[in-house]
Amino acid sequence: AIQSVKEKKADIVISAGNTGALLVVAKLNLKMIENIDKPALSALWPNKKGMSVVLDLGANIECSSKNLIDFSIMGASLYTSLYPDEKPNVALLNIGSEELKGNETIKETYQILNEKNSDNYNFEGYIEGNHLMDGNVNVIVSDGFTGNVALKTAEGTANFITSELKKSMTGNIMGKISSLLNISNL
């Protein structure tokens, strides 16, 4: 599959296999973007206004500010390839929105991105986990540890809400009537 992408016979690889192994094989066989050291796992993340690109979701547990800046470039490039009429807004996932919050790497990255003028994206600063789905930011950048925790938390929350909705709609006669009345909205 990686060879097909290399030979331009395919555009993407989808795998249910080991993510780490896929990244290693891809990095060894495919050309990286110039001056970018590390690949990142990314995903389209639904939000109130459409979709956001979120990266890194687990490939790089520890990152330098250079890596996070590279992820900003990669995420903005991916977003622009999907939505060519929009200039993406990029933010760093952090524990607060204030400039002084976060570890040294995230604060250093903030300073660099805040001073850098990019033609490819607008830097919006920090985004907190409770605003990931607001839709005000198109590209959300984090290290792989933080991104993976956010992803797993969102997945678990979605599963919990789905389970509770199913129980409430099938648990008694009123729930069943309510679900029938709301079937077109669900």
Please tell me what each predicted stretch does.
Residues I61-G129, N138:
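Glycine-rich phosphate/diphosphate-binding loop of Rossmann-like nucleotide-binding domains
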Residues A1-K9, I61-E62, Y126-D134:
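Glycine-rich oxoanion-binding loops at beta->alpha junctions
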Residues K27-A40, N47-V54, N136-I140, G144-L186:
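Glycine-rich phosphate/nucleotide-binding loop
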Residues S15-G17, L44-W45, V54-G58, L93-N94, ...:
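Short beta-strand segments
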